[in-house]
């Protein structure tokens, strides 16, 4: 346990005093909340009796009276504590001792009171009785505002905010609004699908084969079955199995996991939505997608427009449609149509794009598009008709066998949706899988290394013409809430392990300080400078090396100790 601050020690002393007074600082009883800060303000009527509960966020004590702010799930309300209103008899200890001396900012309290308006027009609760519901032992990281209105000590450090999201939500109300909008997005999308008659389903998170995408999976082991299992990287192949089974429209909000890098737009655990509808194609899905996103934008923000950085995005349908070949030709002057792999590789080099021999034709085209085209699409734009090599699960284009019936939706230079006319020819699908294995063997890190034979068996029973679409929910809510980082739209993003201060002995600290000044010393000299006995010296040097603070090196000149 880390050392307690002075404030934390004082709060623990108050906790003990409360218990001495017979007050349970963490009561189990239900508290009969009848009102919220929002409902009080909306339905305000002078003299009305209310019962509210929340967190004490500020207070100004002036002798026998005190104004304070109470924060609940819907906002803040001013409350007024008056000693004689709370303590109507001779015993004034509830105000003088409990409220004034033993409560702190951050404590949860329940309040019974009457409504009134202050002289300056503030809607306020006159406290008639209060109950301590939970004692806070750690002070909140609240900002201070000085006489000039400048804010100090604001809780804005991103790493601290993500690690302590619970504190972030309390002291930064705008953060909570992001997650309220996130829930609105999920609800709006779910309603849209349900109204269309599609079924929400659940598919396995632990899978025997990591299929449906090319990504590095998290691997675990099932002890009872003695087999490896993979955390889901995508749910596509299971949803298609359900189309084979007779469902004509299925969707799932899935937690997916990819054991890859982290940056401003990628988290190892993320949320995707995938939907599959029988008897449709990618043209229908484009129409469906833009109607869906227009509906969601209005549900989240009340308008189809959303600010993102310096851009204003408009999700109002319809969206522009551009083929990948036309996009590359427009931005580079190079026409990829009917070009060989060697010609495309040479063109990429001429465009100063880093390529290597492991890249096949599809990967090369993807690199050109990513480097030269993708970032130019700010408003929602469909990029369509991808090369077959880039889309192993997608149906061959009806008029050009080199292409597939696929689109990606670009917004602000990023892909937020990916959709196909799904491949339902089991023989073609098997050949595509086998080709992917060959690409993976060449070193293509975006090619899949597994063949899902059970999925092929399902296709052999027959799958109707189907269109499917996946949407990155985290990225979509980033655009709808003007957040540049995925960490801002996840309650608890993945973080590196928190660095904790090492607890080492005083002797080890003293020796380490000596070592830091010199960086490297002969072991015998360091021991002599330390003045420690043989026993204490052995213990100290072991402690420093064990905690990776120092290392002992043997050289021709003797034993030396250095700082790690």
Where do the protein language model's features map onto the residues?
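Residue-level "edge-of-site" marker
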Residues: 31, 206, 540, 557-558
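Short, cationic-aromatic polyanion-contact patches
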Residues: 501-508, 522, 552-564
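Hydrophobic residues on short alpha-helical segments
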Residues: 508-515
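Short acidic, hydrophobic short linear motifs in intrinsically disordered regions
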Residues: 517-530
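Short amphipathic alpha-helical interaction segments
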Residues: 532-545
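Short, solvent-exposed alpha-helical "recognition" segments
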Residues: 545-551
């Amino acid at each position: 346990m880390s050392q307690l601050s002075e404030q934390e020690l004082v709060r623990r002393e108050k906790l003990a005093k409360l218990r001495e007074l017979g007050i349970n600082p963490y009561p189990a009883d239900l508290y009969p909340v009848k009102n919220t800060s929002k409902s009080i303000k909306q339905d305000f009527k002078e003299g009305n009796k209310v019962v509210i509960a929340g967190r004490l966020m500020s207070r100004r004590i002036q002798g026998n009276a005190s104004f304070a702010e109470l924060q609940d799930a819907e906002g803040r309300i001013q409350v007024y504590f008056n000693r004689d209103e709370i303590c109507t008899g001779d015993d004034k200890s509830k105000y003088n001792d409990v409220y004034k001396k033993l409560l702190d900012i951050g404590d949860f309290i329940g309040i019974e009171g009457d409504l009134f308006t202050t002289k300056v027009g503030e809607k306020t609760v006159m406290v008639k009785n209060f109950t301590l519901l939970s004692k806070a032992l750690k002070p909140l990281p609240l900002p201070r505002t000085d006489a000039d209105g400048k804010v100090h000590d604001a809780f804005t450090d991103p790493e601290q905010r993500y690690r302590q999201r619970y504190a972030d939500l309390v002291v930064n109300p705008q953060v909570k609004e992001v997650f309220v909008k996130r829930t609105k997005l999920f609800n709006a999308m779910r309603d849209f699908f349900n109204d269309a008659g599609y079924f929400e389903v659940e598919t396995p998170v632990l899978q025997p084969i990591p299929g449906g995408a090319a990504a590095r999976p998290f691997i675990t082991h099932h002890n009872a079955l003695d087999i490896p299992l993979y955390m889901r990287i995508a749910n596509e192949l299971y949803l298609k199995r359900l189309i084979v089974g007779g469902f004509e429209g299925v969707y799932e909000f899935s937690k997916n996991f990819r054991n890859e890098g982290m940056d401003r737009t990628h988290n190892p655990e993320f949320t995707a939505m995938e939907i599959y509808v029988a008897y449709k194609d990618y043209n229908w899905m484009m129409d469906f997608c833009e109607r869906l996103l227009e509906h969601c934008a209005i549900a989240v923000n009340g308008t189809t427009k959303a600010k993102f950085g310096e851009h204003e995005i408009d999700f109002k349908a319809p969206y522009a449609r551009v083929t990948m070949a036309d996009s590359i030709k427009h931005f580079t002057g190079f026409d990829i149509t009917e070009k060989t792999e060697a010609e495309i590789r040479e063109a990429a080099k001429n465009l100063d794009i880093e390529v290597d021999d492991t890249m096949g034709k599809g990967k090369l085209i993807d690199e050109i598009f990513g480097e030269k085209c993708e970032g130019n699409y700010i408003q929602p734009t469909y990029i369509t008709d991808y090369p077959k090599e880039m889309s192993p699960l997608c149906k061959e284009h009806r008029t050009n066998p080199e292409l597939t019936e696929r689109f990606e939706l670009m917004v602000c230079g990023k892909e937020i949706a990916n959709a196909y006319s799904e491949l339902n020819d089991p023989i073609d699908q098997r050949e595509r899988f086998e080709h992917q294995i060959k690409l993976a063997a060449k070193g293509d890190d975006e090619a899949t290394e597994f063949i899902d034979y059970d999925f092929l068996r399902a296709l052999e029973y027959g799958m109707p013409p189907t269109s499917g679409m996946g949407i990155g929910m985290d990225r979509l809510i980033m655009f709808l809430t003007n957040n540049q980082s995925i960490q801002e739209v996840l309650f608890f993003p993945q973080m590196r392990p928190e660095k904790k201060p090492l607890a080492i002995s005083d002797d080890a600290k003293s020796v380490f300080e000596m070592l830091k000044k010199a960086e490297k010393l002969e072991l015998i000299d360091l021991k002599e400078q330390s003045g420690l006995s043989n026993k204490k010296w052995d213990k100290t040097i072991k402690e420093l090396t064990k905690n990776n603070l120092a290392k002992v090196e043997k050289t021709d000149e003797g034993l030396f100790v250095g700082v790690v």
